[in-house]
């Protein structure tokens, strides 16, 4: 059920915006324990009804088999629904799935998250069948796997997941990798604490932000980008004719143009009522504003971002 609702939310959110979105498997992991408790109760009742005399250990063993099967079906649902659902823009949702073990507390929840990550990687290695019945690499969801102390060495607890991720990358060119150690050095908040978190969709990384409305706790989920502008550095170089002074002059002109383009996005969004995309602005995907309230207060400060990309290649 959690996986089904997640994919429905993905499709609806994608229909209300441009660009990608990211979800974390850490947010699905707690539901594994709910299923486990349900199956333990269910198996115990079935054994009692059929006259099977089994101890608690055997009941848990059978329940665990059902948990594994439910994880498999849930992950499969996400993969196939994402590539078959169409947004109102007429395309599959651009979604990234984040796999970070340390995002949940150590214990059963982390063990359950590891099970979900393992199943995601196994299914991506297998791929999906196209209309001709051939196993292919799906474009989405994109996968990001975090390298951390628990999975980077052969004697690490979750080394098997990193091996599986490497096998998946060799065959399917995903997942991409984030180093927790390096990212925590680069993404440091105003209190000097480093953080590891997913990019927004394919590539845009947020700056650290501590939410004053929530005891200054770090906030990364539920934030957004106002718009992206790309600067073609190769074109700037070619236009300069190998003259460095001319290169810097052209670059300054292009950067000013990029700034104007980014501000156009900002001014265009000002005054937008939350009613234009209720799932984003009213129902919690990005905020919980009142009906009729404008989104203006979300367009200022560090909660949102604007992005300037640089292109290093040329299209022929």
Provide a role label for each language-model segment.
Residues 1-303, 316:
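Conserved catalytic cores of very large enzyme subunits
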Residues 308-315:
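Single conserved hydrophobic/aromatic residue that forms the stacking wall/gate
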């Amino acid at each position: 059920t959690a996986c089904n609702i997640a994919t429905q939310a993905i499709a609806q959110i994608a229909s209300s915006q441009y660009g990608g979105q990211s979800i974390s498997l850490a947010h699905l992991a707690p539901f594994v324990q709910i299923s486990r408790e349900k199956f333990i109760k269910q198996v115990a009742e079935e054994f009692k009804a059929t006259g099977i005399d089994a101890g608690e250990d055997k009941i848990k063993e059978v329940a665990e088999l059902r948990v594994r099967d439910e994880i498999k079906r849930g992950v499969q649902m996400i993969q196939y629904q994402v590539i078959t659902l169409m947004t109102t823009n007429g395309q599959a949702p651009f979604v990234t799935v984040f796999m970070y073990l340390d995002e949940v507390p150590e214990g059963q929840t982390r063990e359950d998250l590891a099970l979900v990550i393992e199943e995601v990687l196994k299914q991506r290695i297998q791929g999906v069948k196209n209309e001709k019945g051939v196993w292919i690499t799906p474009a989405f969801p994109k996968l990001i796997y975090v390298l951390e102390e628990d999975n980077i060495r052969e004697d690490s607890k979750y080394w098997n997941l990193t091996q599986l991720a490497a096998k998946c990358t060799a065959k399917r060119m995903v997942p991409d990798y984030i180093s927790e150690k390096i990212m925590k050095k680069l993404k440091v908040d105003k209190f000097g604490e480093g953080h590891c978190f997913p990019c927004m969709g394919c590539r845009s990384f947020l700056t650290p932000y501590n939410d004053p409305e929530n005891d200054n706790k770090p906030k990364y989920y539920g934030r957004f980008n106002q718009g992206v502008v790309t600067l073609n550095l190769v074109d700037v170089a070619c236009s300069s004719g190998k003259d460095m002074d001319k290169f810097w002059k052209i670059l300054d002109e292009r950067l000013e143009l990029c700034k104007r383009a980014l501000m156009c996005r900002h001014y265009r969004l000002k005054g937008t009522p939350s009613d234009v995309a209720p799932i984003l602005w009213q129902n919690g995907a990005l905020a919980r504003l009142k009906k009729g309230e404008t989104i203006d207060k979300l367009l200022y400060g560090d909660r949102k971002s604007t992005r300037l990309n640089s292109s290093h290649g040329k299209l022929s």
